[in-house]
């Protein structure tokens, strides 16, 4: 039974001689069938390995193509990044130039505005001074008009023949022109100017 369980290669010559012819043929066929089944299984395994190998080779080819495409995209992205970086540097330089220009322009505008305000203040002061002068002249003309009113007024009787002495005679009073057009007392035909008798003989 132990000899039957083992293969023919495990039997000695004496054991093989002790076995019958039919037993030897049966064992030989059984071993051939086992070897054939092993060969078939090995062939199937080889086919599976070849199929997997072909699949891996296809994946490798696809990965190579993908790698080439990614490398091309990488080059394009690198070129784009270089271009964008140069544009960024150019934009920063332009921004600095515009900032410098804006600073200089604002400084010039502030200086011009300060000069304009100073001139405006001077003009306002001059205008106030002229107004004060005009008011003083107006008051002076009114006072002189009251003092040298028409004959028969407070200065003398009508038809008395008495007149002011030559020492008190007034000089001719012409219209005063201040030259700036802001005074209303020195203009001819002004409504607030009284008809003054500039000379006692008038």
UniProtKB/Swiss-Prot annotation:
InterPro entries: CCDC85 (IPR019359)
Subcellular location: Nucleus; Cytoplasm, Cytoskeleton, Microtubule organizing center, Centrosome; Cell junction, Adherens junction
Coiled-coil parts of chain: 44-82, 118-141
Bias (Low complexity): 180-190
GO molecular function: delta-catenin binding
Tissues with expression: Expressed in white and brown adipose tissue.
UniProt keyword terms in alphabetical order: Acetylation, Cell junction, Coiled coil, Cytoplasm, Cytoskeleton, Differentiation, Growth regulation, Nucleus, Repressor, Transcription, Transcription regulation
Gene Ontology CC annotations of this record: adherens junction; centrosome; cytoplasm; nucleus
Residues the record lists as N-acetylmethionine modifications: 1
Pfam hit, one: CCDC85
Ranges of Gly residues composition bias in the record: 152-162
Gene Ontology biological process terms from the UniProt entry: cell differentiation; negative regulation of cell growth; negative regulation of DNA-templated transcription; negative regulation of fat cell differentiation
Principal subcellular localization: nucleus
Region span, Disordered: 152-202
Family: Belongs to the CCDC85 family.
Summary of the function given for this chain in its UniProt record: Functions as a transcriptional repressor. May inhibit the activity of CTNNB1 in a TP53-dependent manner and thus regulate cell growth. May function in adipocyte differentiation, negatively regulating mitotic clonal expansion. Plays a role in cell-cell adhesion and epithelium development through its interaction with proteins of the beta-catenin family.
Binding partners and assembly: Interacts with CEBPB. May interact with CEBPD. Interacts with EURL. Interacts with MCRS1. Interacts with TCF7L2; competes with CTNNB1. Interacts with ANKRD26. Interacts with the beta-catenin family proteins ARVCF, CTNND1, CTNND2 and PKP4.
Descriptive protein name: Coiled-coil domain-containing protein 85B
Organism: Mus musculus (Mouse)
